[in-house]
Amino acid sequence: MRRATTAFNTAVNAAKAEQNITIRKESEGRLACTVSEIAVPNEEVDAVLDRFEFLTTETFTVVDGVTADGKTATDLIRPYGEDAALPVNGILNAATVTDTEDGGKKVVLTFYKDTAALDPNGMSFPKDQSKYIDTLDLLPEENKDRTIVSSAELEYPSTKIYATINADGKLVKMDVVAPIEASAKVVVKNLYVNTRFEAVLRDRYTFTY
């Protein structure tokens, strides 16, 4: 397990250090909400709680360390930060499969099931998952300001990372898949709604060096 985790950390941080790289990122999400109690139903509440799906594709070209809008590979590759350093003690299972055709390898990392609490004072992130993968940041910008979640209990049923590393040790593909289950009290213009969320969120990356 340590070998697989180290291989992933080494490859992802090497990709972040690249001065010239093209990053294709697809973000995909599906969210379903069910209402258990609602004080005053109205159209805005209904709009907020509608099931939504999204798929966005972005391509970033890093030249001499930055994109045209000043971002670096470190800003664009999840898990974010200069040093990913996913800890072995946060991983439930890690497997490496060697690709006999090209000498590369596939790494699959499975995190422990984790929980978090959200209250008006902010989010208490799961120690082994969201510290490295800000799962909620996968939501598209247009949905972030539609609700204010006043309190929530979040459960992360085993987030997974799938990574493909070529024979040269370079990260060429990566999927970050994060299922979420949550019960929450949502505020919409001072209306309180108790609801249940279930979501599957994914970031899929392809790297060209």
Give the residues covered by each predicted segment:
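Subset-of-secretome marker
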Residues: 1-209
